[in-house]
């Protein structure tokens, strides 16, 4: 169990580093966010089953639902941005620019 949770924590940190490094393109940022959410989902499900906390068994499912909603909104934003500007740069999403 320890090596699995360590691997999932490393996957989360790697995806977080990916968000920080590849933050110029929206598609790369969305992929890294999805990796973070999936590693959190698996880690939460494993911890709940390991510690026999079945009263909190709905939490991973709720996290997965929010992850799907985040992916849908992100892809809609990606399509809208690429149609308007022709690229997927995050700097195009800054509403404070003229």
From Swiss-Prot:
Its topology with respect to the membrane?
Answer: Multi-pass membrane protein
The name this protein goes by in its record: NADH-ubiquinone oxidoreductase chain 4L
Q: What is the gene called? A: MT-ND4L
PANTHER family noted in UniProt: NADH-UBIQUINONE OXIDOREDUCTASE CHAIN 4L, NADH-UBIQUINONE OXIDOREDUCTASE SUBUNIT ND4L
Q: What does this protein do?
A: Core subunit of the mitochondrial membrane respiratory chain NADH dehydrogenase (Complex I) which catalyzes electron transfer from NADH through the respiratory chain, using ubiquinone as an electron acceptor. Part of the enzyme membrane arm which is embedded in the lipid bilayer and involved in proton translocation.
Q: Where does the chain cross the membrane?
A: 1-21, 28-48, 59-79
Localisation = Mitochondrion inner membrane
Q: Per the record, what is one GO cellular component?
A: mitochondrial inner membrane
Pfam families named among the record's database cross-references: Oxidored_q2
Gene Ontology BP annotations: ATP synthesis coupled electron transport
Q: For this protein, what reaction is catalysed?
A: a ubiquinone + NADH + 5 H(+)(in) = a ubiquinol + NAD(+) + 4 H(+)(out)
Name the keywords, alphabetized: Electron transport, Membrane, Mitochondrion, Mitochondrion inner membrane, NAD, Respiratory chain, Translocase, Transmembrane, Transmembrane helix, Transport, Ubiquinone
The molecular function terms of the Gene Ontology recorded here are:
NADH dehydrogenase (ubiquinone) activity
Q: Of which family is this protein a member?
A: Belongs to the complex I subunit 4L family.
């Amino acid at each position: 169990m320890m090596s699995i949770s360590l691997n999932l924590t490393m996957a989360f940190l790697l995806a977080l580093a990916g968000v920080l490094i590849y933050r110029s393109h929206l598609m790369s940022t969305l992929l890294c966010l999805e990796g973070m959410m999936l590693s959190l989902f698996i880690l939460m499900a494993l911890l709940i089953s390991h510690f026999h906390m079945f009263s909190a068994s709905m939490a991973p499912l709720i996290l997965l639902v929010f992850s799907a909603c985040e992916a849908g909104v992100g892809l809609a934003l990606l399509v809208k941005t690429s149609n308007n500007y022709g690229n997927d740069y995050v700097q195009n999403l800054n509403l404070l620019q003229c």
